[in-house]
Amino acid sequence: MIHPGHILFLLLLPVAAAQTTPGSCSGCGSLSLPLLAGLVAADAVASLLIVGAVFLCARPRRSPAQDGKVYINMPGRG
């Protein structure tokens, strides 16, 4: 369950971001376009790898039939 304090923090985060003055970061450099594109591409690849791993782990596995027999539930036979 999410703690109510966390929800309040998430709601107030845009307000705090709006209060900061632009250029208040000392020593921060701007990101070049190739670096930004590389970060976005790496994030997309990492996301696809995570989705693939979850898909492989979550899909149902087929159990092999024993001795070539398949069990079929047929009431009344027995």
Swiss-Prot record:
It is found in: Membrane. The modification Phosphotyrosine is found at residue 71. Residues 19-34 are extracellular. Its main location: membrane. Residues 71-73 are annotated as: GRB2 binding site. The chain crosses the membrane at residues 35-55. One of its GO terms (cellular component) is membrane. Keywords: Disulfide bond, Glycoprotein, Membrane, Phosphoprotein, Signal, Transmembrane, Transmembrane helix. One of its GO terms (molecular function) is phosphatidylinositol 3-kinase binding. Residues 1-18 form the signal peptide. One of its GO terms (biological process) is regulation of immune response. The keyword Plastid does not apply. Residues 71-74 are annotated as: PIK3R1 binding site. Residues 56-78 are cytoplasmic. It comes from the Eukaryota. Phosphorylated; PIK3R1 and GRB2 associate specifically with tyrosine-phosphorylated HCST. O-glycosylated. It is a single-pass type I membrane protein. Homodimer; Disulfide-linked. Heterohexamer composed of four subunits of HCST/DAP10 and two subunits of KLRK1. Interacts (via transmembrane domain) with KLRK1 (via transmembrane domain); the interaction is required for KLRK1 NK cell surface and induces NK cell-mediated cytotoxicity. Interacts with PIK3R1 and GRB2. Interacts with CLEC5A. Forms an CLEC5A/TYROBP/HCST trimolecular complex depending almost solely on TYROBP. Interacts with CD300H. Transmembrane adapter protein which associates with KLRK1 to form an activation receptor KLRK1-HCST in lymphoid and myeloid cells; this receptor plays a major role in triggering cytotoxicity against target cells expressing cell surface ligands such as MHC class I chain-related MICA and MICB, and UL16-binding proteins (ULBPs); these ligands are up-regulated by stress conditions and pathological state such as viral infection and tumor transformation. Functions as a docking site for PI3-kinase PIK3R1 and GRB2. PANTHER family: HEMATOPOIETIC CELL SIGNAL TRANSDUCER (PTHR21409:SF1). Belongs to the DAP10 family. This is Hematopoietic cell signal transducer. The lineage of its organism: Eukaryota, Metazoa, Chordata, Craniata, Vertebrata. The gene is HCST.
